[in-house]
Regions:
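Extracytoplasmic "Venus flytrap"
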Residues: 29-92, 96, 100, 105-117, ...
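Hydrophobic alpha-helical
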Residues: 133-150, 218, 238-296
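Hydrophobic alpha-helical segments within soluble ligand-binding/sensing domains
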Residues: 116, 173-199, 212-213, 245-246, ...
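C-terminal motif of bacterial Sec signal peptides marking the signal peptidase cleavage site
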Residues: 18-22
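An alpha-beta-alpha
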Residues: 74-75, 79, 93, 182-226, ...
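Flexible loop/hinge segments that line or gate small-molecule binding clefts
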Residues: 139, 143-181, 291-303
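Short beta-strand elements in bilobed, periplasmic/extracellular small-molecule ligand-binding domains
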Residues: 98-110, 172-173, 199-202, 219-243
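Hinge/cleft segment of the Venus flytrap/periplasmic-binding protein
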Residues: 24, 29-73, 312-373
Length: 373
């Protein structure tokens, strides 16, 4: 089975668009309590949005591709920070490099543009053939990216943008998310669970374009469904949350005693959020589908009750190398690739991650076969 999936099927897009439109038509005035009929309509629409993303995305085949011309080429994978999700993608990229014959070098920043820019300049100086930027917005290090273009380096933008966003200057390809529909589904999950009476706090890094966009999409969908439901957005310090977030959560739940939900969009933050919520009944939503978080959901040892799961993190590393390899030789169809995702909760978390992504059981072989190796 294939690992490359098209998440944004036309019927699915039409469904979500029609649901969101219906939500807007049925809104009460902001600040007013919902009537019985309005609440029923809200819950019905919320369930439709939620369920639209619960199912496993459709599979499409990876096009055959001759990897041999890329043997010995150098690709640098630069992550914004050394957090578990990025590390697992990097591990996958290293494994794909060994399988493909591409020399993959991993570099982590500290969450700042300075370290990311320094890494890009180092890669350029050392003659890299390709550079993949994970959670590093190319526009924030534009001078360094411009230098890569002059040097003929293939640069890919990884999980910084959503479907259809324009490609930044100096970038050859991007690995994007279907973030608008994902956030509509997550807002639907909260409203279906709360019967459209939610009080939600969201932590999202404003410094990352994809999470900044996600917070806007979630806010819009949430308020379309329930304009009178309380919602607060707080900036997450992506480079320092391991030291600061637990105390921040403790402060926030004292400040907001009626809080029902926390949506911490960076999956790596879950242990910190859980620690801050010890003994509390606040429900947590997150993103990224990290294996530890999904397993904790199964064992009921976390406050997380819904997670937007990517395909296995290591497989995204293989996708990064695959995209780079195709772009390095000018192959078609690799300029924008959508990262597969699925809304996971108790209805579909199953006994193991293999049950969430059955098509990924042997994804490594799928790649090597498509590469002719």
């Amino acid at each position: 089975m294939s690992v490359q999936r098209r998440l944004v099927l036309v019927p699915a897009l039409m469904l979500v668009a029609s649901i969101l439109g219906a939500c807007g038509a049925a809104e009460p005035d902001k600040g007013e309590a919902m009537s019985g009929d309005a609440q029923k309509a809200c819950v019905k629409q919320a369930i439709q949005l939620r369920d639209a993303k619960r199912e496993e995305p459709e599979l499409t085949a990876l096009a055959p591709f001759d990897m041999k011309p890329n043997k010995g080429k150098s690709v640098w994978v630069i992550g914004a920070a050394r957090v578990p999700f990025v590390q697992r993608m990097a591990d996958g990229a290293e494994a794909a490099g060994r399988a493909s014959g591409i020399n993959v070098k991993i570099v982590y920043g500290d969450g700042s543009t300075n370290t990311a820019q320094a890494a890009v300049r180092q890669a350029t100086a050392q003659g890299a053939d390709g550079i993949a930027l994970i959670f590093v917005d190319p526009t924030t290090i534009q001078a360094a990216v411009d230098d890569t273009k002059k040097a003929g380096i293939t640069v890919t933008d990884v999980i910084n943008r959503s479907v259809g966003d324009p490609m930044p200057s100096g970038v050859t390809g991007q690995l994007v998310l279907d973030m608008k529909d994902e956030m509509a589904a997550m807002a639907g999950w909260v409203m279906a669970d709360s019967k459209c009476s939610a009080n939600t706090l969201m932590y999202a890094p404003s410094a990352l374009p994809i999470t900044a966009a996600a917070s806007t999409f979630f806010d819009e969908a949430y308020k379309r469904l329930c304009p009178s439901c309380e919602f607060e957005l707080k900036d997450l310090d992506y480079g320092n949350f391991s030291r600061t977030l637990t105390a921040e959560v403790q402060t926030d739940i004292r400040r907001k005693p009626d809080l029902g939900y926390i949506f911490s969009i960076v999956g790596s933050t879950v242990p910190n959020v859980d620690a801050g919520l010890r003994g509390k009944k606040v429900r947590v939503l997150t993103h990224d589908g990290l294996a530890d978080n999904l397993e904790a959901m199964r064992k009921k040892t976390t406050h997380v009750i819904a997670d937007f799961a990517f395909a296995p993190s290591e497989s995204i590393g293989w996708q990064i190398v695959d995209q780079q390899a195709r772009l390095l030789v000018g192959a078609e169809g690799a300029s924008e690739i959508v990262v597969p995702s699925r809304l996971v909760d108790k209805t579909n978390v199953g006994a193991s991650d293999d049950g969430i992504w059955p098509g990924y059981t042997d994804y490594q072989r799928t790649y090597t076969t498509s590469w002719g190796l």
